[in-house]
A protein has these predicted regions:
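Metal-dependent polysaccharide deacetylase catalytic core of the NodB/CE4 family, i.e.
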Residues: 20-32, 76-80, 88-187
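Substrate-binding cleft of extracellular glycoside hydrolase catalytic domains
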Residues: 64, 83-88
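Bacterial N-terminal signal peptides
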Residues: 1-3
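N-terminal pre-catalytic segment of deacetylase/amide-hydrolase enzymes
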Residues: 6-80, 122
Length: 188
């Protein structure tokens, strides 16, 4: 999944275009053939990384991308943010070693229930702490990964506060970044 976050402003500084937007590439699973709609083959992921390592691209941390949107800091044109949703175990097993090898920043969005319940196929809190300790940005994706547009305000508050409580206990702070499960939201 690829999206652009922007407020479309472009400035030229020293012949390098500076902009206040970045392209976000979102991944879910790596090397898990039985989930074709959310999986990327490892060979294909390596091809993505090879392309993104070319000088025409600028891989940035999500925090820098958000600063660009807020017009606090412009980023180079063709800046790319890598995000990974859902904290599947294949992230730690396959994607993390590749991203670490090339020192590429990324954000991992986590729903806390599947981690707390030790659901097979998901990362552990220990693995999430290892990523955090190595500079990976950890974001929230609620407690139970619900379809948020179906929730009332009390349910939304519950999902977010319980998730934040778990993050504080397990990694020492609540995430400053949030991703809507399924990309769905309501105006509450």
């Amino acid at each position: 999944f690829i999206t652009n976050i922007s407020l479309a402003q472009e400035v030229k500084e020293n012949k390098i275009n500076k902009v206040n937007y970045a392209t976000v590439i979102m991944y879910h699973r790596f090397g898990e053939k039985r989930y074709p709609s959310t999986n990327i083959r490892i060979e294909q992921f390596l091809e993505h990384i090879d392309e993104l390592l070319k000088p025409k691209y600028n891989i940035i941390d999500i925090k820098d991308g958000l600063k660009a949107i807020e017009n606090i800091k412009l980023v180079r044109d063709r800046s790319v943010i890598i995000t990974i949703d859902d904290a599947y175990s294949s992230v730690f097993k396959y994607a993390w070693p590749i991203l670490k090898k090339y020192n590429l920043p990324f954000t991992l969005f986590v729903s806390t229930d599947v981690i707390d319940n030790k659901i097979p196929g998901y990362m552990s809190w220990e693995e999430i702490r290892i990523l955090r300790d190595n500079g990976v940005t950890i974001g929230s994706q609620t407690k139970s990964h619900p379809h948020m547009h179906n929730l009332n305000q009390d349910q939304l508050i519950y999902e977010l506060s319980k998730s934040n409580d778990r993050f504080i206990k397990e990694i020492g702070s609540k995430p400053k970044i949030f991703a809507y499960p399924y990309g769905e939201y309501n105006l509450n």
